[in-house]
Amino acid sequence: MLPGNTFKPIPSFASLREPDRVSKNLDEIDLKILAEIQADGRITNVELAKRVGISPPPCLRGVRTLEEEGYIQGYRGLLDPRRLGFDVTVFASVHLSSQAEADLRAFEAFVRAEPLVRECWMLSGEVDFILKCVAPDMATFQDFVTHLTAAPHVRNVRTSLVLHNSKYEAAVPLDLKAVG
């Protein structure tokens, strides 16, 4: 792991609507650094510098700048939920009875406190939020759904059990950024 790395939390949904999130022009070195770190978050600075084609000190400065500017939000290990006993993955579509800003924030706070919810996305259209949830078994998930449907302003919840994951790619397609 690179020295000086710290986890930076992902911003709330409300902050994603702020206009100051415009991407700076990333140069070729920035994109190479991001691609290498995205492929291997445990890469050493010396190895990263070699792969990117620069010396270690400017490489480390580049990584720190990308961290400070929020391009690198943190470093995590990818774990296998099934091997850890989380055999059930479900997507839950949540419809709220109110879309007032305070109610949306309250729902987001509710979801952040729920350990079975691994991702929460606010959507436009027929569904207000979609949640990706994991559970050790269906009984545990059903208890969570009962709890979720009782939350303030939740009008209804529809769930879809994952049968098979055909693709999981956490990486951002940087090759498209380089072309565009």
Model-derived features: where do they sit?
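A compositional/biophysical signature of low hydrophobicity enriched in polar/charged and small residues
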Residues: 1-180
